[in-house]
């Protein structure tokens, strides 16, 4: 910045850190069709309040984002509602698998593939369709890896033993490490065979981490906040609030994922932000819905891990800002550089505060972090150079983010 330029305004940032705005490459903002849970307006407010300036939304909406027409519909919704920048994944299905080579690379961050049942009806399991998807895709594939037959058999056995809705404490046993590892191995083998860039979503197990090479730019892995912050013992305290797919697993898995943040096996951090009405979270491993809101508290939660010595703040910025831009080829975002968009977040350390329900911006109005005391605060968030969030307040309800653009990949 040229020092002789006159400032439009002066911001007191004494004692603060200025970072690139967070790029959350894994959110479910629920538009269209699931707006009782959240929408682009409410969830982008939560993002802005958390220092997240760019999000990439997943395709398992109603209807699912699996055609150009539905993608354009979602783009229009985001343009009208989103306070932060936005991008999208196109869902892979048996119906569109043979046409994935024709997807406009300027419109999407990549292809989302569900190799395992989760929320929505997008899972693809038959081998011929999977091969077609990997053969046809010209874009990065982000994949949810779990083996559904293994999970189905486990659920049947646990229902026989514990009744129709086993306690949520069994969720990690019903969706075990073996199901993740088997599916991840298959996805990696297909990516190697067809020379496709693969990003494996939400790693949950220590065993999966052995499948990744820190120096491999083709095959990469994501960690998500639920699996970094929680472990199986937290089911007793938080119940189905932390039920998600893949499941929050064991303390040894969490420790391994945290260690992989610094050795390069984890390339990005996302939230898998997936709001549900609190009434939908009643029940156990079978009946409670899977997913939790997290986009508002991802940055301050990761800064706690910085304070605990899990990773340095520079590495956190790489995982949450730089690398999402690199992996998906996002243009002019993710870095504090001349010529880049001014997506910025100002954060302050040594400023403890405890989360009350009335500070939650997500439409669902609950968080697994309620009652938690954070040591960092998001002071201000700037999206495209404009102040969107200032010390607890959305500054202008009419500001809108932009659709992100991509470099050749």
Protein language model regions, located:
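Histidine-rich, glycine-flanked metal-binding segment
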Residues: 1-19, 404
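Metal-associated gating/positioning segment near the N- to mid-region
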Residues: 13-81
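Divalent metal-coordination and catalytic microenvironments
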Residues: 15, 26, 47, 51, ...
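Histidine-centered catalytic micro-motifs
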Residues: 21-32, 142-146, 203, 271
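A glycine-rich helix N-cap at a beta->alpha junction
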Residues: 76-92
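Histidine/acidic residue-rich metal-binding segments in metalloenzymes
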Residues: 98-269
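His/Asp/Glu-enriched, well-ordered alpha-helical/loop segment
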Residues: 165-195, 241, 262, 267-269, ...
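C-terminal cap of metal-dependent C-N hydrolases
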Residues: 284, 338-404
């Amino acid at each position: 910045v040229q020092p002789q330029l006159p400032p439009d305004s002066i911001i007191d940032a004494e004692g603060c850190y200025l970072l690139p705005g967070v790029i959350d490459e894994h959110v479910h903002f629920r538009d269209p069709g699931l707006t009782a849970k959240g929408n682009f307006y409410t969830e982008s407010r939560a993002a802005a309040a958390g220092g997240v300036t760019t999000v990439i939304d997943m395709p398992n909406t109603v209807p699912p984002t699996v055609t150009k027409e539905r993608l354009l519909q979602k783009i229009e919704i985001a343009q009208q509602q989103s306070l932060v920048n936005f991008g999208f994944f196109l869902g892979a299905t048996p119906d569109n698998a043979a046409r994935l080579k024709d997807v406009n690379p300027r419109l999407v961050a990549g292809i989302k593939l569900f190799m395992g049942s989760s929320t929505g009806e997008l899972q693809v399991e038959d081998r011929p369709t999977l091969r077609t998807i990997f053969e046809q895709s010209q874009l990065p594939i982000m994949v949810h890896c779990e083996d559904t037959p293994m999970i189905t058999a486990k659920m049947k056995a646990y229902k026989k033993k514990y009744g129709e809705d086993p306690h949520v404490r069994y969720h990690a046993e019903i969706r075990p490490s073996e199901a993740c590892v088997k599916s991840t191995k298959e996805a990696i083998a297909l990516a190697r065979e067809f020379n496709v860039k693969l990003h494996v979503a939400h790693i949950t197990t220590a065993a999966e981490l052995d499948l990744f090479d820190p120096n491999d730019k083709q095959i990469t892995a994501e960690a998500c906040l639920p699996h970094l912050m929680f472990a199986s013992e937290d089911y007793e305290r938080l119940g189905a609030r932390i039920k998600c797919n893949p499941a929050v697993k064991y303390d040894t898995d969490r420790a391994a994922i945290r260690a992989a943040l610094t050795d390069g096996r984890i390339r990005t951090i996302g939230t898998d932000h997936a709001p549900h009405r609190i009434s939908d979270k009643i029940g156990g491993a079978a009946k409670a819905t899977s997913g939790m809101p997290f986009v508002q508290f991802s940055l301050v939660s990761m800064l706690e891990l910085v304070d605990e010595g899990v990773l340095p703040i520079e590495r956190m910025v790489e995982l949450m800002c730089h690398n999402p831009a690199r992996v998906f080829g996002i243009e002019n975002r993710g870095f504090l550089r001349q010529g880049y968009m001014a997506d910025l977040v100002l954060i302050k350390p040594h400023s403890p505060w405890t989360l009350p329900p009335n500070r939650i911006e997500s439409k669902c109005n609950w968080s697994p972090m309620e009652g938690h005391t954070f040591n960092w605060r998001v002071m201000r968030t700037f999206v495209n150079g404009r102040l969107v969030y200032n010390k607890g307040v959305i500054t202008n309800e009419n500001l809108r983010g932009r659709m992100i653009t991509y470099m050749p990949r």
